[in-house]
Amino acid sequence: MGLVMNRAKIILSSVETTSAQLSLHNISKVFQGRTSPLDKLRRRTSKEFVAIADIDLEVLPSTFVSIIGPSGCGKSTLLNIIAGLSQPTTGHISINGQVVSAPGPDRGVVFQNYALMPWMTVAENIQFAVETVYPSMAIAQRKSIVQEYIGLVGLRGAETKHPHELSGGMKQRVGIARALAINPQMLLMDEPFGALDALTRGFLQDEVERIWEQERKSVILITHSIEEALLLSDQIVMMTRGPAARIAQVLDVPFPRPRRREELDQYPGYHDLKAAMEQHLSYETRAVEESRIRK
């Protein structure tokens, strides 16, 4: 796959003339600090915090993209903007050429904290999403979709269980099924495996790889894990530290699919990619720590 980079834009592409599915244009996000009553009396203005700045990115259809960077660099802020859950201070995003500024069924979101309705069963959590997006759909068709995605994520037999009866891995599988059941154009995943133990995390990574092979949705994954990004991604977006975090570099991951984690380090270029990511994260993290010491 080709990687085109210039000052204005970073384009992830295998064919340069193919239209991007997701486009981010000059995205910045500024948060206003709180102003105390004393500051108001003294007529002090609140301080601004620039979380991300000057983000330009285009992603082609059916592409798995991971975003990685030091803690606090605005990865989740960027994902929330793509999801329509937060508005950029400058710039805009578009999907298939249409500017979007709110959540929509074209983007399914999987959260780290699961975000399941505790009073609903597994099937009801998924069905609620389908009913919300497709209110006029026949009941039988809704139920068929729910069962299809329960099967896809390997939860047959758990349809009537409530979230408190599920392990963390099972809850996350419900979240993935719920996001996919509305048939989005892309899946947005905010550190979905961060709270899981190593064995469960590895199992779900393999499940996501399998599901991606079957569904071929575009995926944007936020992660702290170099190995996870290399296992799952077609491209890896590396961000600088905040404030005013930017895209530092985009790495193309040329490994064949389907991938086997036990063979990952044998792929040509694996060690070079891993070393580049380790060097970037080490440099950015060290700079963050040094800036904290100086304060």
What annotation goes with each model-predicted range?
Residues 162-166, 170:
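Conserved ABC ATPase signature
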Residues 138-158, 210:
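Conserved ABC ATPase "signature" region
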Residues 83:
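Helix-to-loop junction immediately C-terminal to a conserved catalytic motif
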Residues 68-70:
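The feature captures the beta-strand-to-loop junction immediately N-terminal to the Walker
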Residues 120-129:
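Short coil-to-helix segment of the ABC ATPase nucleotide-binding domain corresponding to the Q-loop/switch region
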Residues 91-103:
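Conserved ABC transporter NBD signature motif
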Residues 181-185:
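A short, proline-enriched helix->beta-strand linker immediately N-terminal to the Walker B motif
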